[in-house]
């Protein structure tokens, strides 16, 4: 790997990617890792699938109790679905059809483990529910069948697949235009569950032309629960990275999302922000489309929302936008984002602090004016405190932010970081297990040492003022130790730093690593310990 800023490239900023410590592929991988980590957390504030569980009223309680008794007895081996129920479902009597569909729906609404497999393994039942979806003359039957199918689709991928294979998706999309709001809402819910299952299911729903009717519904609906469900379904249509949805098929939702960001409902705001975070997660063309929709100022305002479930996805969206080029990053800065990010660095939520550091790290990977804006916002003192005290995953992001600033900053800006005490916490990172972060810390220290060398030449003193600071922070000992690191890039960098900035006066060639031609790696001799042991 090339050094972060080799002597021949001191004043050269690579324009093809945000962080000139890394090549473009590495930077892309870093952003993907962020996404994976987020998915692993199974975000508590957003479920990809939702089961519709009714609130039982007293009138229905006795019937439900009897039904539940029957369900409990099924655990002893008896089937919860009787032959009579199936016969009634296939009856020509619409009243019997409705009553039986309600029975199935109630079973499928039971928590915590509804008998989904038993229902889908009963021949013809799912197909019958799909058939009932077409009964425009009987909206109550449509609603009950849609509810039952929604709860089946809330299950495993295999269970969701059964609903798709029965041909439900195109009919659900037609029902988005139903004259009955309950039917519309249940159709939205079902489609959200199906789209939330996998990228394959998401793309199938998109290819069935869901977007226009869904956006029409979002534009016209005045029912809050409907709008909430529709925005949640929309966020599932935008979600996913491997692969992402075809951008042309989801980008038409941007104007609607822009309007929804001014809702006063936290649930709705959260899902709108998640949708925007998904849409902005990718190449600069996607980021530009999000910027052009006019959402940036409102997203920055929502960083200060008092509900964590809104501030978190707003931060993710803002963070994704600043992974773009310097001009795109500047759009966010022009919305007064830095005071908000400074505020978030003191959040009680570690995940928010980490995301804020990650966002700032992409701003400090920008141009010198942008680094200066971070300085002027008084953010670096807090970052350096985080670098010393926070959880490791947050310290990592703070390290990126500081090293990026040393990479692209002016001499004055780098001196400012040194004056804040950035050297010791960077030295402390040299002993961590994460090789990438060791490299980040080494790169930051190298940038500082390079500046010191330039200053010593200019002053004629011949003394690099930063070598002593690194030695005082036990950094030299740690860099020497890294010469035996298993990672080739780390031990080569450590050797180069020692040789160039801390070279011994007698220039003992025996200290240089030998090269193992067969293994294509350096071999470092183990230094002999003095008889009385090492004195640290």
UniProtKB/Swiss-Prot annotation:
Expression sites (tissue/organ): Only slightly detected in Ehrlich ascites tumor cells, thymus and skeletal muscle, clearly detected in kidney, spleen, liver, heart, and lung. High expression in testis.
Region of interest: NLS binding site (minor): 316-404
Recorded GO CC terms: cytosol; host cell; NLS-dependent protein nuclear import complex; nucleoplasm
Modified residues (Phosphoserine): 6, 113
GO biological process: entry of viral genome into host nucleus through nuclear pore complex via importin; maternal process involved in female pregnancy; positive regulation of cytokine production involved in inflammatory response; positive regulation of transcription by RNA polymerase II; positive regulation of viral life cycle; protein import into nucleus; symbiont-mediated perturbation of host defenses; transcription by RNA polymerase II
Compartment(s) of residence: Cytoplasm
Source domain of life: Eukaryota
Matches recorded under InterPro entries: ARM-like, ARM-type_fold, Arm_3, Armadillo, Importin-a_IBB, Importin-a_IBB_sf, Importin_alpha
PROSITE patterns assigned to the protein according to its UniProt record, in alphabetical order: ARM_REPEAT, IBB
Xref: Gene3D superfamilies: Importin-alpha, importin-beta-binding domain (1.20.5.690), Leucine-rich Repeat Variant (1.25.10.10)
Every IBB domain range: 1-60
SUPFAM superfamilies: ARM repeat
Residues with N-acetylmethionine modification: 1
Disordered, as annotated region: 1-29
Family: Belongs to the importin alpha family.
Protein name: Importin subunit alpha-7
Source organism of this protein record: Mus musculus (Mouse)
Gene: Kpna6
